[in-house]
Regions:
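Conserved Rossmann-fold NAD(P)-dependent oxidoreductase catalytic core, especially the SDR/UDP-sugar
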Residues: 104-146
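NAD(P)H-binding glycine-rich loop region in Rossmannoid oxidoreductase-like domains
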Residues: 60-98
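SDR active-site strand-loop-helix element
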Residues: 10, 34, 76-79, 118-123, ...
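C-terminal substrate-binding subdomain of Rossmann-fold SDR/epimerase-dehydratase oxidoreductases
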Residues: 200, 205-208, 212-332
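N-terminal Rossmann/SDR dinucleotide-binding element
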Residues: 1-75
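Glycine-rich NAD(P)-binding loop of the Rossmann-fold in SDR/ketoreductase-type enzymes
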Residues: 61, 94-105, 141, 145, ...
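Conserved catalytic-core motifs of eukaryotic protein kinase domains, centered on the activation segment
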Residues: 43-44, 86-93, 129-133, 181-182
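NAD(P)-dependent short-chain dehydrogenase/reductase
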Residues: 156-211, 216-227, 255-257
């Protein structure tokens, strides 16, 4: 086992981070969370008293903060970003400042301060629209948006810095789905499930675009697995992380079927043509990583969370919708 004890999770209070952090603590890592907490300050409440957790409220663009918090860190799992195309396009200057401009010094400071391993959450949308049945990690990137373009550029920045003592790994996740303490209801499966349960109708925009998905429990298990891998196995590696590839129309049909075949589905036109079907063959062969959780499980998890009141006011509370929060706080 690699001798890695302290993990810094940027964006650790976000949708993925708030599921990942408790798993790392369960594995007895010391965990430091760096986050702005703009989506809520209580998402890590169940583990707040854990002596191995340190929460730092701050901005990854603050270099002095990074210089103060990174020393003593063995691993950085970098999740923090303006995390989808609509939120990025709301203020492209802001998006670039967080997603790309801040990334360069983050990597430099990490390397200079002896961080052993840097795991970067990129996106599978870097591929753009592909006609191939299976999009592999070696295919050229053809991003359709600045959000995806700068995600790809960050990959280049990180992999250039990799050395024997600074292990760099890139994950290109599919769209994540399922329940989280920091719930998002602006992701494909989650959107359709929310509207089916709480609005009584599913509206599909377009429908034929392919959207790969991965359950939030699987993507967070993957990040834990990467900490346990020998350095040589993941050095300078790029991995797609996906389980199920479906069209949006098919996802809507899965939602309807899972909830009892009672929800009408309406089809609306769209000009969002992002479509991709990614292969997870490499990560399965090299790391023996097999996702275990299905879209149906994500739907049922969300249904249970709605029933238990864990996602109050799902149609109106802006905290579940990244772009609405960004608009409300006027982040600069």
């Amino acid at each position: 086992m690699p001798d890695l004890k302290t993990v810094l999770v940027t964006g650790g209070a976000g949708y993925v981070g708030s599921v990942l952090v408790p798993k790392l603590l369960d594995k007895e890592y010391k965990v430091k969370v760096l986050d702005l907490y703009i989506y809520g300050e209580d998402v890590l409440a169940p583990v707040k008293e854990n002596p191995n957790l340190k929460e730092v409220r701050g901005d990854i663009r603050d270099r002095s903060l990074l210089e103060g918090e990174i020393p003593g860190t063995d691993v950085i799992i970098h999740l923090a970003c303006i995390s989808n195309d609509p939120s990025y396009e709301l203020d492209p200057r802001l998006g670039k400042s967080i997603n790309y401009d801040a990334f360069i010094p983050l990597v430099e400071i990490a390397k200079r301060n002896g961080v052993k391993r840097f795991i970067y959450a990129s996106t599978s949308s870097v591929y753009g629209v592909k006609q191939e049945d299976e999009v592999t990690e070696d295919m050229p990137l053809e991003p359709l948006t600045d959000y995806s373009k700068y995600k790809g550029k960050c990959e280049e920045v990180l992999l250039r810095q990799a050395t024997e003592d600074f292990i760099a790994t890139v994950i290109r996740p599919a769209t994540v789905c399922g329940y989280s303490p920091r719930q998002r209801l602006d992701l494909t499966v989650n959107i359709l499930t929310n509207h089916a349960i709480n609005n009584g109708q599913i509206t599909v925009f377009g429908g034929e675009q392919k959207r790969p998905n991965i359950h939030i429990q699987d993507i967070t298990d993957l990040y834990v697995l990467l900490l346990e891998q020998p350095a040589h196995k993941i050095q300078r590696k790029i991995y797609n992380a996906s389980y199920e590839n479906h069209t949006i129309r098919e996802i809507a049909e899965i939602v309807n079927r899972t909830l009892g075949d009672r929800i009408p589905i309406a089809i609306q036109p769209t000009n969002d043509m992002r479509s991709y079907h990614i292969s997870a063959k490499r990560i399965r062969q090299e790391l023996e990583f097999e996702p275990r959780h299905t879209i149906e499980e994500a739907i049922l998890d969300l249904e249970g969370a709605f029933e238990l009141g864990r996602i109050p006011n799902p149609m109106t509370d802006i905290r579940y919708y990244n772009i609405k929060v960004m608009q409300a706080i006027h982040m600069t």
